Amino acid sequence: MRLLVKAPAKINLSLDVLHKRPDGYHEVKMVMTTIDLADRIELIPQMDDTIQIISKNRFVPDDHRNLAYQAAKLLKDTFAIKQGIAISITKNIPVAAGLAGGSSDAAATLRGLNKLWNLGLTLDELAELGAKIGSDVSFCVYGGTAIATGRGEKITPIPAPPPCWVILAKPSIGVSTAEVYRNLKVDEIPHPDVDGMVEAIYRQDYAAICKLVGNVLEEVTLKKYPEVAHIKEQMKRFGADAVLMSGSGPTVFGLVQHDSRLQRIYNGLRGFCDQVFAVRILGERHSLD
């Protein structure tokens, strides 16, 4: 029996870094939401006791560096699973883009193998396992919209924002998340109002949400990568209601409610940026069905 699982991308509507922890991680407070740009994960049982990664994307590692591989290995080791698995990954989410593509692939693998191998784990249990793989994996196990705290693994679900378009643009550069965090001086920069964002979402106040978007990591990435700053400026100029970098970058997203304006922004960005997507926010959390 083969199993297909969707692995949607995420954006950060608000991302704050509070301080560096004794364990080397950073304490964060974020509002994240899934969007309907998704990788496609196909899980194919194997006769031998191996884990294989299959992908046509040359940027996807096919060994232990791949987070989906790590997810499968974690379940095999934890529950003494002797069956092998091939994980076919069709990438639609740009790689190393600040959209949690790798983390979402891992989360989809956890959810899918939980079903395929009849493990009977809850989403909470899968999210706890996911935290061992990466900071964004726990959120990606649940999906929907949530506050993430700790190093990103403590998840509190909240309602989805009001319906709107999300336009994404990724320049053809890579950004090292570790390097961005290394260069972040949390005591010397302005911090976004994460609680205000949460309140605005509960009120379904689109205008307030647009005013409150914020990402503390922009302080590092925009200075080092002028291409990202340029996309932000152009997206604003083309008429997006709010513009923000997602994660550590380099992807920039804009929020917009009107179809005509969306088309104008999309066409304008396509003039100088190869990877541009127009998507919607996914309001629903994942289920175990």
From Swiss-Prot:
> Could you tell me which pathway this protein works in?
Isoprenoid biosynthesis; isopentenyl diphosphate biosynthesis via DXP pathway; isopentenyl diphosphate from 1-deoxy-D-xylulose 5-phosphate: step 3/6
Q: Which EC numbers characterise this protein's activity in its record? A: 2.7.1.148
Write out the catalysed reaction.
Answer: 4-CDP-2-C-methyl-D-erythritol + ATP = 4-CDP-2-C-methyl-D-erythritol 2-phosphate + ADP + H(+)
List the catalytic residues.
10, 136
The positions annotated for binding ATP are 94-104
Gene Ontology MF term list: 4-(cytidine 5'-diphospho)-2-C-methyl-D-erythritol kinase activity; ATP binding
Q: Which enzyme class?
A: transferase
Keyword terms = ATP-binding, Isoprene biosynthesis, Kinase, Nucleotide-binding, Transferase
Listed InterPro entries: GHMP_kinase_C_dom, GHMP_kinase_C_sf, GHMP_kinase_N_dom, IspE, Ribosomal_Su5_D2-typ_SF, Ribsml_uS5_D2-typ_fold_subgr
SUPFAM superfamilies reported for this sequence: GHMP Kinase, C-terminal domain (SSF55060), Ribosomal protein S5 domain 2-like (SSF54211)
Which GO biological process entries does UniProt record here?
isopentenyl diphosphate biosynthetic process, methylerythritol 4-phosphate pathway; terpenoid biosynthetic process
The family classification in the record reads: Belongs to the GHMP kinase family. IspE subfamily.
The protein's role, per its UniProt record? Catalyzes the phosphorylation of the position 2 hydroxy group of 4-diphosphocytidyl-2C-methyl-D-erythritol.
The protein here is known as: 4-diphosphocytidyl-2-C-methyl-D-erythritol kinase
- Species: Geobacillus sp. (strain WCH70)
Higher taxonomy: Bacteria, Bacillati, Bacillota, Bacilli, Bacillales
List the gene name.
Answer: ispE
